[in-house]
Design a protein with these regions (language model features):
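A short, well-structured juxtamembrane/interface segment
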Residues: 37-49
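Adenosine ribonucleotide-centric catalytic and binding domains
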Residues: 49-101
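Extracellular/periplasmic catalytic domains that process cell-envelope and extracellular macromolecules
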Residues: 51-52, 106-109, 186
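Short, well-ordered beta-to-alpha junction loops that form the rim of enzyme active sites
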Residues: 62, 117, 154-158
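Conserved nucleotide-cofactor-binding alpha/beta core module
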Residues: 96, 100-104, 109, 123
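Short active-site oxyanion
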Residues: 146-152
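C-terminal capping/extension of enzyme domains
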Residues: 1-36, 86, 93-96, 119-146, ...
Length: 233
């Protein structure tokens, strides 16, 4: 049931530890064998094929698409190339703030770690496995933030509840396109950018919504100041 082929060795110790602890142990041994679930077995841990030292930005999603054959193992990325409303709004924000069109398919190769809060879901039952994965996800977030401080996109309440697990946080808040140029820079900081989840309802609420969050522009400013290659969104 548990397929770990392709996982980078930098993640193997923490993954082995996590899947042998409750409640994940019960999920894999008792629940998943008896139900239809998403994504495919070989894609459950797909996100961990990236070496930890290559991560520049972590995007925390919710749980996999529960419709058969749509979940890819990476947040926001649909296996059928269907563009969800959330991803449409992400692309709109990318275009508005950077002038780029946006293509999530090229993100992983640039060091963007597309982590769902839960890595499995019962087919047709969104949110059904979130409680099983919460401890594991917290552990992964602590591990990444300690081993390789980076930039974090926390969109929505589900992602933001993991903020407490991030070491040495620097909250990117109160900046605009001019002030962001003066942001304090340290390779010891985990830069946290927060906004509502990019659903249609939150996209159009101006300063209180996803629209105008400027995360994609600000992330590139931070990367450039850290002497890292900027993201081609």
């Amino acid at each position: 049931m548990i397929k770990l082929e392709g996982i980078h060795k930098s993640f193997l110790p923490v993954i082995y530890s996590g899947i042998n602890q409750e409640p994940l142990k019960s999920l894999f041994e008792n629940i998943l064998p008896a139900i239809s679930f998403q994504p495919r077995e070989e894609d459950i841990f797909k996100v961990f094929r990236m070496p930890i030292d290559k991560i520049k930005i972590v995007v925390i999603g919710q749980d996999p698409y529960s419709i058969p054959n749509e979940a890819s193992g990476l947040c926001f990325l649909n296996e059928t190339n269907k563009v969800s409303n959330s991803l449409k709004n992400i692309y709109r924000e990318i275009n508005s703030s950077t002038g780029m069109e946006g293509d999530i398919h090229c993100w992983e190769q640039q060091g963007i770690f597309l982590l769902n809060s839960a890595l499995t879901v019962e087919t047709g039952n969104p949110g059904s496995h979130i409680s099983y994965w919460e401890l594991f996800t917290s552990t992964i977030i602590r591990y990444i933030s300690y081993k390789n401080p980076c930039i974090w996109f926390l969109w929505g309440k589900m992602a933001q509840k993991f903020e407490k697990d991030i070491y040495s946080p620097f909250i990117v808040k109160g900046y605009d396109n001019k002030l962001i140029q003066d942001i304090p820079i340290s390779n010891q900081y985990n830069y946290i950018l927060k906004a509502p989840y990019p659903i249609t309802e939150s996209y159009s609420k101006g300063a209180s919504g996803f629209y105008g969050c400027n995360h994609f522009k600000y992330a590139n400013v931070i990367l450039e100041k850290l002497k890292e290659t900027k993201i081609q969104w």
